[in-house]
Each structure stands twice: as structure tokens, then as C-alpha cells.
Amino acid sequence: MSKIFVNPSAIRAGLADLEMAEETVDLINRNIEDNQAHLQGEPIEVDSLPEDMSRLHLDDGKLPDLGRMSKAGEGRHQEDFQMDEGEDPSLLFQSYLDNVGVQIVRQMRSGERFLKIWSQTVEEIISYVTVNFPNPSGRSSEDKSTQTTSQEPKKETTSTPSQRKSQSLKSRTMAQTASGPPSLEWSATNEEDDLSVEAEIAHQIAESFSKKYKFPSRSSGIFLYNFEQLKMNLDDIVKEAKNVPGVTRLAHDGSKLPLRCVLGWVALANSKKFQLLVEANKLNKIMQDDLNRYASC
């Protein structure tokens, strides 16, 4: 009678797949519960209504003036987008960035790619900075902090194309610096196509291609993941890894790369399975800590 031998690695792989399947089912159940929360019949507290709801009133015999309401709405929109002269611009900007961060997390949880979200967010921040932090020519850097409260009359000047280009570059740099994570380095080295840098990144990734790294899961636990599970070519992984802030500079210096951070970045942008399993907030903190630790070495 013949005996059937089962490879232990196949058993471990099957158990890992079962664990991932259970976590996926838990995630789907939580999403269903969240989407049906409005059907549970929970009462609405009057105190929790938005502030504008208290201004609404009903008239029995008069129809609302639609023209007046549209003008009021436009004025309200402009007030929300532009800063009041008496308010601190730094506090408003910080509040705006907090809202941007919340929006990024929501979009990432919905399955959108991080790079697409980030490019759109940068453009929005640039628009915000351009409107609320004007940079008129002829001002010194010392009185930039008082430019929002100054009452001096504006002088009409004809700006040259080179001046407009420099101002747009300054606003873009300001937005990237202010909106990016605090310790991430936005440098030109990340955009260099240096073959030696790509070779160094590919070499370090290839050495740890099958090594499994720990990542936080949505079920308040951890799961293991490696580069091999991405099902991507090494060239594509290297191309995506060069977008991680600071990685190109570390590779150029021959330093050790934060491979767990690189794997999390690439997987979050290319693997739907990884997006379903990972806890985005904890992952961002882990990636930031890895970058800080390797950059300080």
C-alpha cells in the first residue's frame, strides 16, 4: 500500500492562506456593519447637528429667495477657502493639513493608489498656499510672517514669465515640504536615473526577496509578507522603490536600505491583497520610523 507524503511547506502555505482568508472575511463583515449603521435606528441628537442647521427656518406663505441664497452660498464658500485677517494663518494651515491627512487615509482605505492620491493632494495644497500665502516680489524673507495682516495698498506690477515660474516653484516646494511627513526628504536625488543606484537597490532587494517581514493587520494582529508575494519583476520593484523618499540617497551612499519600508510602499501601491490585510495608519508610522532610523545611521 503506497504512502502519501505531504510537504510541510505546503501545509504552512495553506495555513497562511487560511489566516488571510479569515482576516478578509472579518474585514468584509466590519465593512457591512459600518455601511448598515444608519439602519440601526439610533436617534439623532439635536446638539450634534451642524452649526448651520440652527439658522434654518420655515415660512408658511413665502418662498425662499433663491438668488439671495446662491449669493450667500458663494460668499460662504469664499470665506471658507480664504483666511480672515484676524486669524492666525499658521493655525488655519495646520487645521487644513489635518483635514488633508484624514482624507488621504480614507482614500487609501477605499483602495486607491497612494501615488495617485499624493499627486492630487500636492496640487490641492499648492492651490491653498498660492491663495492664502501670496509671495509678492520685492518683499524680504523677514516680513513674510506679517504679509497676511498687512494693510498696505497693493502695487500693480507686470511680472515677467521667469518671475512667475520662480514663484510657482517656490509654492510647490513649500507645499511639498509642509504637507509631507516631517522627516521625509524631498530631494532631487530621488529623481536621478543612476544605474549604480538602481543596481544597489536591486542587489539589496534580491538578497532579501524571500525574507518575510512583519506588518500590522486590520485584525489587531500581524501578518508576514515578502517581495516574492508581489508577483512583480525585480525591475518594476526597483522602479517603484526609487519613489520612496530617501531611498535613492541611501543607495547612492551604499548604505543599508529600509527594506520593510520599501516592501510596504510597493505593496500598498500594487497589491490589492496587501491593501485588504494591512492597517494603513500603523503601516505609515512603521514606514516613517524605519526611514528615520536608517537615515540617522
From Swiss-Prot:
GO terms for molecular function: RNA-directed RNA polymerase activity. A motif (Nuclear export signal) lies at residues 49-58. Transmembrane segments: none annotated. The keyword Ion transport does not apply. It comes from the Viruses. The modification Phosphoserine is found at S162, S210, S271. Residues 158-180 have a biased composition (Polar residues). CDD domains: RABV_P-protein-C_like (cd21032). Belongs to the lyssavirus protein P family. This is Phosphoprotein.
